[in-house]
A protein has these predicted regions:
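Conserved Class I S-adenosyl-L-methionine-dependent methyltransferase catalytic core
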Residues: 1-150
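Alpha-helical subdomain
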Residues: 1-52, 145-315
Length: 315
């Protein structure tokens, strides 16, 4: 229900004040009676408010479904309602076979799918920007990036995390590295932030090579998407690109070890099984990846978000 309201843009239509369900139905080309039933339910859980005569208005929760607000989650809701919804319906297939549910449903991997569907890729990129907004602030507050000269954000997408780092630290320069569809829109994003003079955009595949020249290599929510074997391939390429005094920085959810302890990390791990075939990892599992690729895990820093900052250096 939340997805449908986001897809129809109901919150945007209510930006300038309450509107009748009849007008909303005409604007969205939907059935007035069925739209009323949808909005009546959403109003019962605090998303929109039902007024007299079948009028509806925004609530603080509904404001997150607007398109052009700094705290918007609209693209994230649409992403979960479209590309994510069907694969989760096939999680039984994943549990029985070990195959990624997304691949089973869409007949290709998630990143291949987005390469073939640019409109869906645009929604995904914006969704990841929205998802990462709060954790980005938490990471910036927990870690000193000012000590680096050149920071390489590997798989950095549109550049929202890199932009936040550069805005908070005057000295470092950046390299934004991702697949062509990943950095689509990055130039405009960085230009709008007045950061293009400090950040170079490089297209490429981190399974093939990673740009050299950085003294910090950031992987934010990257390894969780991949199997151990593929992670080892990425880390070997990073080891090859990195100077001897460079720093490896992985920003991810760490799966907590205690049995029976409730944790978002365990749900997130299951989500990766469904979507990418990757997995969440414990501290010990990260240490094993580092040891297999010539790195030493030197520090883990908690943040005021689900992610932690995992530091490593070359051995």
């Amino acid at each position: 229900a939340i997805y449908v309201s986001a897809k129809l843009g109901i919150a945007d239509l209510l930006m300038d004040g309450p509107k009748s369900c009849d007008l909303l139905a005409k604007s969205t080309k939907t059935s007035q009676r069925e739209l009323f039933r949808l909005l009546r339910f959403l109003a019962s859980i605090g998303i929109f408010a039902e007024l007299e005569d079948a009028f509806f208005e925004l609530t603080p929760l509904a404001a997150y479904l607007q398109s052009e607000t700094p705290s918007s989650l609209r693209s994230l809701v649409i992403y979960y309602g479209e590309e994510t919804y069907q694969p989760w319906g096939s999680i039984l297939h994943s549990i029985k076979t070990g195959e990624t549910a997304f691949n089973h449903v869409h007949k290709c991997g998630v990143f291949q799918y987005f390469a073939q569907h640019p409109e869906s890729a645009a929604v995904f990129n914006q969704a990841m920007t929205e998802y990462a907004a709060e954790e980005t602030i938490a990471v910036i507050n927990a870690y000193d990036f000012s000590k680096f000269d050149k920071i390489v954000d590997v798989g950095g997408g549109q550049g929202s995390f890199m932009a936040t780092i550069l805005k908070a630290n005057d000295e470092p320069k950046g390299i934004l590295f991702d697949l062509p569809q990943g950095v689509r829109g990055a130039k405009e994003y960085l230009e709008t932030a007045y950061l293009m003079e400090r950040c170079e955009i490089i297209e490429g595949d981190f399974f093939e090579s990673i740009p050299s020249g950085g003294d910090a290599y950031i992987f934010k929510n990257i390894f969780v998407n991949w199997t151990d074997g593929r992670c080892i391939d990425i880390l070997k390429n990073c080891h090859h690109a990195m100077a001897e005094n460079g720093k490896l920085i992985i920003i991810e959810v760490i799966v907590i070890s205690p049995k029976n302890a409730p944790s978002f990390s365990k749900l997130f791990d299951l989500h990766m099984l469904v979507m990418t075939g990757g997995r969440g990892r414990t501290e010990a599992e990260f240490q094993a990846l580092f040891a297999a690729t010539g790195f030493n895990l030197t520090n883990i820093i908690s943040t005021e978000s689900p992610v932690s900052i995992i530091e490593g250096v070359r051995i």
